[in-house]
Amino acid sequence: MPINAITSDHVIINGANKPATIVYSTESGTILDVLEGSVVMEKTEITKYEIHTLENVSPCTILPGLVDSHVHLNEPGRTSWEGFETGTQAAISGGVTTVVDMPLNAIPPTTNVENFRIKLEAAEGQMWCDVGFWGGLVPHNLPDLIPLVKAGVRGFKGFLLDSGVEEFPPIGKEYIEEALKVLAEEDTMMMFHAELPKAHEDQQQPEQSHREYSSFLSSRPDSFEIDAINLILECLRARNGPVPPVHIVHLASMKAIPLIRKARASGLPVTTETCFHYLCIAAEQIPDGATYFKCCPPIRSESNRQGLWDALREGVIGSVVSDHSPCTPELKNLQKGDFFDSWGGIASVGLGLPLMFTQGCSLVDIVTWCCKNTSHQVGLSHQKGTIAPGYDADLVVFDTASKHKISNSSVYFKNKLTAYNGMTVKGTVLKTILRGQVVYTNANGVSKTPLGQTLLDSRR
């Protein structure tokens, strides 16, 4: 069995940054041993292995491959927006070794087993990282939920308002209550895009203000998120019996934090995530007409951004994800700069590690938020997100001393457009290892052969 080892004075293990050597099999793709302390080849612990190669990457840091649990790959059906090939290549270029694909924006959406089969066929031979899948909560598919669990989806996502694509309509309170019953005994999760406009509320603004970011922001106020989360919590509290865990995706409003905090304190199984763009960008920075910053919920104020950081450090927000939601430049309506008539989504898979490090986060915290907690959310905490024996040998070599500039031309996305264009960030991914195989180096780019696998085993 071919065995390699990689060592550094800086390895993120057991919630600390310390010297260690990782011994892994390139055949099984798993970690065999983690030897703490500076490596000495004469040590008994390492001489028991027939090491083929030992690589010392000091002073760079080794951390587990990131798990991005919120990615739209859009295949099949909207491959002009993204696809498995380009989306997963972008992931590994930034140290993301696992992504979980959202059920919408592909055609057909992942709302029944047949649609899921079509998606799995489309993914075959095109995955540069490992890929899991979410199923969809849409009207009339309650009978499809348990079959989808058995087919391998890791949970379900639904919208409480228009999703932006007609094939993925929103659900209401009655559906949520029924789905909680249907999935109560299943090993799964229910997730929600938590925005809920009031029935009489007009989201549109006068035509002349459509270029103004402030107009778009005011059209989707904090109350949308607060009202949606209140509805979801009301359904949970009304359920007289077991419920599956519930997750609020891409939380943008700090004003909703007290609701989550109180629900968790009362014992409700509720978690939430936020996104890199909500932590790294504030509304005050967004120029009028700059529709590449549009996302839903919207990026809010600087004080709101700071409030999200506080909630993340407190643990009320548990994880940070990309919500990679790309589209063609035409759908961003760049020439007109109309925020109301452009696609809402920010392309950013693979950019999160240096973005978070630039914000002053320790790598230990980044691993907690972007590896450990996301792997737990998707039911992969036994396999992904941790450097320990028995786990997949998904590893990232990160140069903390370097800086680089993010540019539209350098990203691997199909459409070279990101809100971070021109931003200088700290830290560079030098190498990404997926299950013991090098799949990316900063010097040579992505591997020629896709080595990613689908993750269809039951949650654990």
Swiss-Prot record:
Instruction: Kindly list the GO CC terms recorded for this protein.
Output: cytoplasm
Tell me, in a sentence or two, what this protein's role is: Catalyzes the conversion of allantoin (5-ureidohydantoin) to allantoic acid by hydrolytic cleavage of the five-member hydantoin ring. Involved in the utilization of purines as secondary nitrogen sources, when primary sources are limiting.
Q: One Pfam family, short name please? A: Amidohydro_1
Keyword entries, A-Z: Hydrolase, Metal-binding, Purine metabolism, Zinc
Q: In which pathway does it act?
A: Nitrogen metabolism; (S)-allantoin degradation; allantoate from (S)-allantoin: step 1/1
This chain belongs to the protein called Allantoinase
PANTHER family named in the record: ALLANTOINASE
UniProt: Zn(2+) 2 binding residues: 157, 193, 250
Q: Which reaction does it catalyse?
A: (S)-allantoin + H2O = allantoate + H(+)
Q: Which GO terms describe its biological process?
A: allantoin assimilation pathway; purine nucleobase catabolic process
Q: Which GO terms describe its molecular function?
A: allantoinase activity; cobalt ion binding; zinc ion binding
- Per the similarity annotation, which family is this? Belongs to the metallo-dependent hydrolases superfamily. Allantoinase family.
Q: What cofactors does this protein use? A: Zn(2+)
Q: Modified residue N6-carboxylysine is at which positions?
A: 157
The set of disulfide-linked cysteines is none
Q: How does it assemble?
A: Homotetramer.
Enzyme Commission number(s): 3.5.2.5
Posttranslational modification, per the record?
Answer: Carboxylation allows a single lysine to coordinate two zinc ions.
Query: How are cofactors bound according to the entry's free-text note?
Result: Binds 2 Zn(2+) ions per subunit.
Q: Which residues bind Zn(2+) 1?
A: 70, 72, 157, 323
Q: Write down the top EC class of this protein.
A: hydrolase
Classification via InterPro entries:
Allantoinase, Amidohydro-rel, DHOase/Allantoinase_Hydrolase, Dihydroorotase_CS, DNase_TatD-rel_CS, Metal-dep_hydrolase_composite, Metal_Hydrolase
